[in-house]
Amino acid sequence: LYHGPRNDLPRDYAPKEVIALLNERKNDIYCVRGNCDTEVDQMVLEFPVLSDYCVLAEGTQAIYATHGHIYNEQKLPPLHSGDILLHGHTHVPKCVVHETEQYICMNPGSVSIPKEESWHGYMIWEGKNFVWKDFDGQEHTVFRIENDSVRRRS
């Protein structure tokens, strides 16, 4: 909900509206704490937001979700072959398959402060698909988990 002291105030900044939108979807959201999130955010949100990480399962793969300021591509959490590291922090959407280390790194981008000329958007996980969308619902990129690897869907 907070943009941090190093970032300009986002255009159309409306944290109370965001709170209402998020709370409406509280049963659909898995959340991890970002480096600007605090106990004040937890007081107004109706789902947990202060966990440093969460581990989700997709078949035999683990999806290690974290903000990215502690664990990231340069400092990996414990991963097994084929696991997915899902982190933000850079505010730049991406999906990279690291063949040598045998893991996949994904970044959902940023809803409020996208960087490096990326779009205001988000990523959703539906079944075996990871979909990056903008606020108009346009799909920018879709990746699908197949046989413990990730493939770009055409």
Report each predicted region and the residues it spans.
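Generic structural signal for conserved hydrophobic packing positions in ordered secondary structure
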Residues: 22, 56, 65-67, 109
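Conserved beta-sheet core of the metallophosphoesterase superfamily
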Residues: 62, 69-148
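Short catalytic-loop micro-motif centered on adjacent basic/acidic residues
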Residues: 31, 64-65
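Active-site-proximal loop/helix segment associated with metal-binding centers of metalloenzymes
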Residues: 3-11, 113-115, 151-153
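Core catalytic region of metal-dependent phosphoesterases/phosphodiesterases
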Residues: 1-58
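Short acidic/glycine-rich loop or secondary-structure boundary segments that cap or lie
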Residues: 2-6, 39-42, 64, 72-75, ...
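Non-catalytic terminal accessory segments
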Residues: 26, 145-154
